[in-house]
Amino acid sequence: MQNLSAKDFYKPCRYNCETKNQMWMSGIADSHDSWCDCDTPFAHLLASIFPPGHTDRTRTIQEILTRDFRKTCLSGGADATNSGMAETIEEKREDFQKEEKEDFTEEQNIEDLLAAVADAEGRYQTNQLKTQETKTNMMCPIQSKKHYKLLTQQKTLLPRCSMTGTTDGVALHQQLLKECNKTSQLIHLSNLIQTQNQHPRKKDYYQSSTTHKRKRKRSTNVSSLSAKKVHARSRKRRKTSSSSSSSSSSSSRNSSTTS
């Protein structure tokens, strides 16, 4: 019984990892409250672990956790190289910087590839615009001198902004072509309307002329009929006059014979 030690009384704790961690954090807070009255014990703890001038002061928590998970934990302080547990910090820092550089180079390579793809797409689009086929627009048929003059004036007055190689010039060229097509269509429609309006006038004139001719024919027919009637009447009168004269002559002859 005289050889009893702490090992003889030790038994493993029945709590799980979460409860143990909570008990450890509460123990840290309780021990802090026993000698300091500030409301931020864990910030006080971090400030004591990473004082000003420490190599890990400017690093993020994620970087420190990944490094300490992979390698042995370094002791804090302004002179971390003087502790026995610290290994060559400069070598570890160089390794960490190399890893950061590798990550940065990978991101830079990805950005370079994306930029190259964008440049290639732009060149392909410009080549397509340069090599696109020129569409032959079907113009409306010229039906009068005014139409011809309008078309020639449009060709001379249209400004040539740029060639078809550039993107802005192509857009302007297409807009101008659309406007020209619209104007030519409007001119064609106006000409059709004018021709449609002119045809009924010709028909009316033709109809009026035909009616006048018919009237004239009717008048000529009427005059011929009236002339025939007049001739017939004159003939009848002549016949009657001749018959009367013959009767008078016969009566005179009879009277002469009787005497």
Curated annotation (Swiss-Prot):
InterPro entries xref list: DUF755 (IPR008474), HEV_TT_vir_Orf2/Gyrovir_Vp2_N (IPR004118)
UniProt entry tagged with the keyword Translocase: no
Compositionally biased spans, kind Low complexity: 241-259
Region of interest (Disordered), ranges: 192-259
Biased composition, class Basic residues, residue ranges: 228-240
Keywords: Coiled coil
Coiled coil residues, start to end: 82-128
Name of the protein this chain belongs to: Uncharacterized ORF3 protein
